[in-house]
Amino acid sequence: MKDNFSFAATSRNITSSLPFVNLNMSGTNDLIFNCSHKPSDKHLEAIPVLYYLIFVIGFAVNIIVVSLFCCQKGPKKVSSIYIFNLAVADLLLLATLPLWATYYSYRYDWLFGPVMCKVFGSFLTLNMFASIFFITCMSVDRYQSVIYPFLSQRRNPWQASYVVPLVWCMACLSSLPTFYFRDVRTIEYLGVNACVMAFPPEKYAQWSAGIALMKNVLGFIIPLIFIATCYFGIRKHLLKTNSYGKNRITRDQVLKMAAAVVLAFIICWLPFHVLTFLDALSWMGIINSCEVMAVIDLALPFAILLGFTNSCVNPFLYCFVGNRFQQKLRSMFRVPITWLQGKRETMSCRKSSSLREMDTFVS
């Protein structure tokens, strides 16, 4: 028997811990159930267009990354293996966007059945975590390349063979709640069957708040600590070195790229996790304002969309900026790519060990 769900079950749905049930449930914040509101037509018309746009751009740039890796001859670097897995995770995440765009186009009416709801909901969550975890691995690997250049030069690809399965396993474990609870439920006053998180009614608020906080901790706080720590470690180390001329230019480029990784992660994911945290506070009864809850419900789809743009940005941060990117494309397509030509001479000078290792890491 399908339970009846309210609008909050849909607006926070794709990666957050909704919905809530219109039943008498112990331990819930009763105010939440009195704050029902319908989404505007403009709101629901804009979201699918933006989702398809992110899908097209992100899929294209990540396909290039995967193609470059597959066409690369000889042994693969540890950093290249991480970049490849990051691109795969982003591709799989982006591949689900057309379904969610359709979901919004039909006003939160899920047309693909309960099995697809569970599978694609879990698939999205799994690859979202995998993408974030691999970004964290890239930051740690980059830190090691700069701080311990001689040790990092002796890294073998087999070392990544341990890290990569571990990351995917962690992502799978993080998505287990979604796989277990994701299901189709009816929202009567909207006249739709929504793909939602069907938590146990008697512990609904606790589950909703707990899953939201888990996403905050595993998907943002812990990765940000690692990413930011690695950046400041790299910055401190490189600023201590006496670099002149072209070496100084390279050092500044490295620092800018390291800073760009941190800023991109914060800009893309902070809004979603702030709203998710506010959502958890509303379930715990700490936030008791219908206006705040309305903002959460209406803003979350756009915050999730902003998080997805990180999958479009990643190839530019980790692959396309390398000084051998043009060479790799030429090797793959065997045609000159004149539009990528630029001043590369600053990257060809003899560098210090840490700068040289850092430069090849993103190439």
UniProtKB/Swiss-Prot annotation:
Gene3D superfamilies found in the cross-reference section: Rhodopsin 7-helix transmembrane proteins
Region (Helix VIII): 324-333
Membrane association type: Multi-pass membrane protein
Cited CDD domains: 7tmA_AT2R (cd15191)
Record topology, Extracellular segments: 1-45, 105-114, 182-206, 282-294
Annotated angiotensin II binding sites: 103-104, 182, 204, 215, 279, 297
Keywords annotated in UniProt: Cell membrane, Disulfide bond, G-protein coupled receptor, Glycoprotein, Membrane, Phosphoprotein, Receptor, Transducer, Transmembrane, Transmembrane helix
GO CC aspect terms: external side of plasma membrane
Record-linked PROSITE patterns: G_PROTEIN_RECEP_F1_1, G_PROTEIN_RECEP_F1_2
Glycan-carrying positions: 4, 13, 24, 34
SUPFAM superfamilies for the chain: Family A G protein-coupled receptor-like
Entry note about domains: Helix VIII may act as a gatekeeper for either suppression or activation of the receptor, depending on post-translational modifications and interactions with various receptor partners. Helix VIII is found in a non-canonical position, stabilizing the active-like state, but at the same time preventing the recruitment of G-proteins or beta-arrestins. Upon switching to a membrane-bound conformation, helix VIII can support the recruitment of G proteins and beta-arrestins.
Protein name per UniProt: Type-2 angiotensin II receptor
Organism: Meriones unguiculatus
